[in-house]
């Protein structure tokens, strides 16, 4: 694929990815976008899927928009009063009730360790309606926040959290475009994603020198990872897997799709 046109690269890469996915269990949606060439490909990219923690990207973008408009301040403090502390990923649940965090700290925890309580505190502060309105304004047709993290949706679609591979890549584009304008908020969002501590997906088969800023998400049978890849040909990649027999199987799929893209775009040297 080296030395070919962008179209030839896309066609060959998409074929390689499709051939690989045909052999894998479960279902996988992929969306990839080259930032410089402004071209990409999508495999099932508009399929509406359980978002898992990828929905936290939308919460982060809405927080930064509220800060930009002067309706929120990253230094604003919120006390975790309990007694119901959200389970699942995170460290806030391990701390004493009454601990105080700034919005900046909550966002940091929400992204780098996927803290569910931090996400819920931010959702309460911003408002679920406002977050969903942000999704609509951004043109995210398959993305919806219907519940707090770890809350029971009771099988009702409108009470669950959804997204798609294409919507996730679009959100990452918004973050990159915000940073490109010189906005400190844009650079901050990328710095949070670059400090991601949950690995095993996009970075699984890549050497340490490859720079990736990303966000993972997982539920029973669901493994997602989406990120920004830096290099001479920077690109965005979202790989969403569902109906997985085990978590590691989904992560293996994500890792191989990521490796195929990294090879195609010359990230491996």
Labelled PLM ranges:
Residues 5-24, 36, 40, 125, ...:
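Structured C-terminal helix/loop/strand segments within mature extracytoplasmic catalytic/sensor domains
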Residues 38, 50-78, 110, 237:
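Active-site SXXK
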Residues 24-27, 120-177:
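Mid-domain, small-residue-enriched loop/turn segments at the edges of structured enzyme/sensor domains
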Residues 25-48:
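Short, conserved catalytic-motif segment at the N-terminal edge
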Residues 43-44, 102-105, 113-118, 148-156, ...:
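Flexible glycine/proline-enriched surface loops and loop-helix/loop-strand junctions
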Residues 85-120, 161:
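Conserved catalytic neighborhood of penicillin-recognizing serine enzymes
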Residues 42-50, 92, 96, 157-158:
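A short glycine/serine-rich beta->alpha loop
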Residues 69-95:
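Short, glycine/proline-biased beta-turn/loop segments that scaffold the active-site neighborhood
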């Amino acid at each position: 694929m080296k030395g070919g046109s962008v179209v030839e690269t896309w066609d060959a890469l998409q074929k390689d990815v499709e051939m690989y996915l045909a052999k894998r269990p479960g279902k996988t949606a992929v969306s990839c976008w080259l930032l410089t060439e402004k071209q990409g490909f999508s495999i099932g990219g508009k399929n509406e899927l359980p978002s898992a923690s990828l929905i936290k990207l939308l919460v982060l973008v809405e927080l930064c928009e509220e800060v930009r408009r002067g309706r929120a301040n990253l230094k604003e403090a919120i006390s975790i009063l309990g007694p119901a502390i959200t389970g699942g990923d995170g460290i806030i649940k391990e701390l004493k009730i009454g601990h105080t965090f700034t919005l900046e700290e909550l966002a940091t925890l929400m992204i780098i360790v996927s803290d569910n309580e931090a996400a819920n505190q931010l959702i309460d502060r911003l408002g679920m309606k406002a977050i969903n309105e942000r999704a609509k304004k951004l043109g995210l047709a398959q993305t919806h926040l219907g519940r707090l993290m770890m809350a029971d949706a009771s099988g009702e679609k409108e009470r669950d959290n959804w997204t798609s591979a294409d919507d996730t890549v679009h959100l990452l584009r918004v973050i990159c475009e915000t940073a490109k304008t010189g906005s400190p908020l844009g650079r901050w969002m990328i710095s949070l994603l670059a400090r991601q501590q949950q690995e095993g997906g996009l970075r699984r088969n890549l050497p340490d020198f490859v720079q990736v800023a990303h966000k993972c998400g997982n539920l029973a049978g669901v493994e997602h990872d989406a990120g920004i890849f830096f290099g001479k040909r920077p690109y965005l990649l979202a790989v969403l897997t569902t109906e997985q027999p085990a978590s590691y199987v989904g992560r293996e799929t994500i890792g191989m799709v990521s490796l195929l893209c990294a090879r195609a775009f010359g990230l491996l040297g």
